[in-house]
Amino acid sequence: MINKETKIVVLMGGPSTEAEVSRNTGSAIAEALESIGYRVIPMEYDPHHVVENLKKAGAEVVFIALHG
């Protein structure tokens, strides 16, 4: 189980034609997690730099909100 201090990245968007739907989903997930006290980092999916970006953010948990 994760605690409230765990850094949760919500991964959304990206190059898909469903990117906007993904952003809407990701934003709703991030809001819900924040409303119950979790540390959330919304992140736009960049397929060329995803690992690097997750490391820079200090992600401990990744919630994947990608569509398409």
Spans of model-derived segments:
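ATP-binding N-terminal substructure of ATP-dependent carboxylate-amine bond-forming enzymes
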Residues: 1-68
